[in-house]
Swiss-Prot record:
This is Erythronate-4-phosphate dehydrogenase. One of its GO terms (molecular function) is NAD binding. It is found in: Cytoplasm. PROSITE patterns: D_2_HYDROXYACID_DH_3. Substrate binds at residues 45, 67. Keywords: Cytoplasm, NAD, Oxidoreductase, Pyridoxine biosynthesis. GO terms for biological process: 'de novo' pyridoxal 5'-phosphate biosynthetic process; pyridoxine biosynthetic process. It comes from Pseudoalteromonas atlantica (strain T6c / ATCC BAA-1087).
Length: 374
């Protein structure tokens, strides 16, 4: 069996060794001729899988993406070939939720907010939105959920409408890109909805760039409209509108889900799917390959308490300001968006770390965030 995998899949060589003849490729070089004899094709969002790529391949039996999103897969074409759509839905949900927490604590400091007095409106209650609700609950932060497709499908959680979301202090977007139809999310935040935002609100987009009309957002800023916006995703990536960048409070290069665990978990999920489809025993686990974080134990600063303590802890693991600073200072360089994503620094999830809480009274909140006890 011929297995071709993109070079950006962490630990793919280790996971797929022994399942067949494994070949690695770069998204920059991949073409139909290169993968013409592939039985299994494993990609990330940088490789578009369509008729052009697979027209010369008569062997393909499995196509999988080690990402939660599938917009780079031509689903109609793959189904016409009798191929299911395989993805790693939820693989980076924890990572994105922790990215949002970092943004919240940074913006709370900037805006002099006590987060427990604020309400977060979460649009999209799938994998990421659900993980975010768990983190917010641990911190005692109120939230509302809006997800019409899930509500209509019978999900029994307490959902609100977008009018209610627009009244929240913080709005965090976690929807898939759906263009057209009843549940359209393309330009969900168009000029009209952007115009409804208040200067004392915070808007976070860590899902798909096209969910916010970037041209309308830029026009609002240029007209003097004051908004607090955090963007990890942009329209027309990687060729984004650089004129928008200086106006964004925290700006990053679509890396919210790029923890070591988040990316590698996608590879593990594809490994499990391939084993199931082809009758192999899935004996390998992500924990077999993940390195121990350095340091692996965090000791709380006993001079801090409350939000300051939690903020210091979260930002010691991941401080979004560093990524935003690099992004803003270098994005004008050629192909920098891709470069940042490709060469992203090591970032670990809370669950990889243990915390020595000492006599801190809020230790249960820390463990509920996902940290381990020391």
């Amino acid at each position: 069996m011929k297995i071709y995998y993109e070079d950006s899949l962490p630990y793919a060589a280790e996971f797929f060794a022994g399942l067949g003849d494994s070949q690695v490729f770069s998204h920059k070089d991949v073409n139909g001729e290169l993968v013409a004899d592939a039985d299994v094709l494993l990609v990330r969002s940088t490789t578009k899988v369509n008729a052009e790529l697979l027209k010369a391949n008569q062997n393909i039996k499995y196509v999988g993406t080690a990402t939660a999103g599938t917009n780079h897969l031509d689903k109609e074409y793959l189904r016409s070939r009798g191929l299911d759509i395989h993805s790693a839905a939820g693989c980076n949900a924890v990572a994105v939720a922790e990215y949002v927490l970092s943004a919240l604590f940074v913006m709370a400091e900037k805006l002099d907010w006590q987060l427990t007095t604020k309400t977060v409106g979460i649009v999209g209650a799938g994998h990421v939105g659900t993980r975010l609700t768990e983190k917010l609950t641990a911190l005692g932060i109120r939230y509302h959920l809006c997800d019409p497709p899930l509500a209509d499908a019978g999900d029994t959680r307490d959902f609100v409408d977008m009018d209610t979301i627009m009244q929240c202090d913080i709005i965090s977007l976690h929807v898939p890109l759906i263009e057209g139809g009843q549940y359209n999310t393309g330009h969900m935040f168009d000029a009209k909805r952007i115009g409804q935002l208040r200067k004392d609100q915070l808007l976070i987009n860590a899902c798909r760039g096209e969910v916010i009309d970037n041209k309308a957002l830029l026009k609002s800023f240029e007209s003097g409209y004051k908004l607090n916006v955090v963007l990890d995703v942009w329209e027309n990536e990687p060729d984004i509108d650089q004129a928008l960048v200086p106006y964004i409070a925290l700006a990053t290069a679509h890396i919210a889900g790029h923890t070591v665990e988040g990316k590698a978990r996608g590879t593990e999920m594809l490994y499990q799917q391939v084993c199931e489809q082809f009758g192999f025993n899935a004996t390998k686990k992500l924990s077999d390959y993940l390195p121990a974080p350095q340091p692996s134990i965090i000791t709380l600063d006993e001079t801090l308490s409350g939000q300051a303590q939690l903020s210091a802890l979260v930002l010691s693991v991941y401080d979004i300001r560093k990524d935003s600073k690099q992004f803003k200072e270098t994005i004008e360089q050629p192909d920098q968006f891709r470069y940042i994503r490709k060469n992203y620094s090591i970032r670990r999830e809370f669950a990889a770390l243990s915390v020595n809480t000492g006599n801190y009274s809020g230790s249960e909140a820390i463990y509920a965030l996902g940290f381990n006890r020391k």
